[in-house]
Design a protein with these regions (language model features):
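PRPP-associated nucleotide enzymes
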Residues: 1-344
Length: 344
């Protein structure tokens, strides 16, 4: 197997940006590369094809279909006995269908005597249901972890989990990787001046601080929401100096875009000269598109962990590819090499 080391010319338009591959590892021992098999579910075949190109292999043949009653069917079309299998499937909309498809793929591989089955989940659905906030609720993120484990997965590879503690919901190894290298490279390419990294809420401070530290130790600001009394609107304050600066709002996902839009408006009110939104997962539930293209952002920067269809594209949107990060991680897992060293 040969990984591509050629650099792709970046395109900063609406199209997906193919970033240069990360530094590759040198295998410490010979291995049978024919034992690495890559398959894709139906959730994001474009990303899976990019990962396959990075690794220099083809996606494995697989039949997927839906019966008249709605049941899903999956069949692996080649022998995977004794192989290390990687199944690429983000649990994005429709979440339940894609999750069930992943479980069926994992089970099919286990029953086909695969040596190892790694569920590659660029976007982990139900991640926000990571704890009980009221009585008689499910901790659905834990339930999903149980389902994936019981289906027969040997390992999980996930990107930018909403809560890092989700790794502990699994009784199998979890490799948690980050989209920050491609996001940071893109921001650096723009040569922005007077950058301040902003967390849209208190819960995202650790994520924003880590991002700021890697962005040339940029200063950090926090948007703090407070409700003074019942039936009184929330008051939003900015902790930190943003006046005359280029504000980069950093979050793990953009869903309905309500939080990040409110953040942009309060930053403008406090004197920020430009506002960029930066997130890994483009969930984009209605009315996100209307909110994001309203002129409050210079750019909205996301990645392709979730496919963004043409009808959700707008002039300010930039979609970056994380295929090189996921591809390199798969290679390192297969070669028993360090994954964490990619993000130091």
């Amino acid at each position: 197997m040969i990984r591509s080391n050629s650099k792709c010319t970046p395109s900063w338009g609406d199209a997906v940006i193919h970033t240069a591959p990360l530094p590759t590892t040198t295998p410490s021992h010979a291995s049978d590369h024919s034992r690495l098999k890559l398959f894709s579910g139906s959730a994001n075949t474009a990303l899976a094809q990019e990962i396959a190109r990075y690794l220099g292999i083809d996606l494995g043949p697989m039949v997927r279909k839906r019966f008249a009653d709605g049941e899903l069917y999956v069949q692996i079309q080649e022998s995977i006995r004794g192989c290390d299998v990687y199944l690429i499937q983000p649990c994005c909309r429709p979440v339940n269908d894609h999750l069930m498809e992943l479980l069926i793929m994992v089970d099919a591989c286990r029953r086909a005597s695969a040596r190892q089955v790694t569920a590659v989940i660029p976007y982990y659905g139900y991640a926000r249901a990571d704890r009980k906030t009221a009585g008689r609720e499910s901790i659905t993120a834990k339930l999903v972890a149980n389902l994936i484990t019981q289906a027969g997965a040997s390992r999980v590879l996930a990107m930018d989990l909403h809560s890092a503690q989700i790794q502990g919901y699994f009784d199998i190894p979890v490799d948690h990787v980050y989209a920050s290298p491609v996001l940071l490279d893109y921001l650096r390419s723009k040569n922005l001046e007077d950058i301040v990294v902003v967390s849209p809420d208190v819960g995202g401070v650790a994520r924003a601080r880590a991002f700021a530290n890697k962005l040339d130790d940029a200063p950090l600001a926090i948007i703090d929401k407070r409700r003074q009394a019942h039936n009184v609107a929330e008051v939003m304050n900015v902790v930190g100096d943003v006046k005359g600066k280029t504000a980069v709002l950093v979050d793990d996902m953009i869903d309905t875009a309500g939080t990040i839009l409110e953040g942009a408006r309060v930053l403008r009110r406090e004197g920020a000269k430009e506002v960029y939104a930066c997130a890994t997962h483009a969930v984009f539930s209605p009315p996100a598109i209307e909110r994001l293209q309203g002129g409050d952002f210079e750019e909205v920067i996301v990645t392709n962990t979730i496919p963004v269809p043409e009808n959700q594209r707008f002039p300010q949107l930039r979609v970056l590819s994380v295929a090189s990060i996921l591809g390199e991680t798969i290679w390192r897992i297969h070669e028993d090499s360090s994954v964490s060293s990619m993000f130091r």
